[in-house]
Amino acid sequence: MDKRVYGSEGVALIECINPKYRKYRVRWDVQPNYDENGTSGGVSFLETEFKHKPTMAEVKDTVLGWMNKKIDEEILSGFVWNGMKVWLSTENQFNYKAAYDLAVQTQGASLPVVFKFGDTDSPEYHTFSRLEELADFYMLAMAYINERLSTGWASKDAMDWSEYEKLLNE
């Protein structure tokens, strides 16, 4: 299980923590810690434990799996439209597309349509009465998803695996 841990700068990305039982920890997302004055004080990182020396494929699966989950979470709950939080689950994306497509095909005759935004504790309902407003919402939602995916792909492509490979080959 991945967990956020705090430690010293220069922490090893792969470490055998118990040679007798062949326990290894793999670490990633190393970030500096700052106090209230902005002074750096150690680092935080994610780590997971293996009961064997991990392979490079296992390291990549672990780190990329976390990155994919982070991207999915950003898509799911990070979009805000007109000050309202929009939940972009797969089901909601389908519903937004279906409503948009039908409105375009009927030149707006299928409107109005109401969507629930916000969250469980503070829902907000918005009525789309004009095709232009629905199109604006839908296009911005799709642009947000595409931007998050592009940013995620760039982060994964920029990942430097050489330190992991070096530590695994020691």
Label the predicted regions.
Residues 2-170:
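A preference for well-ordered globular domain cores
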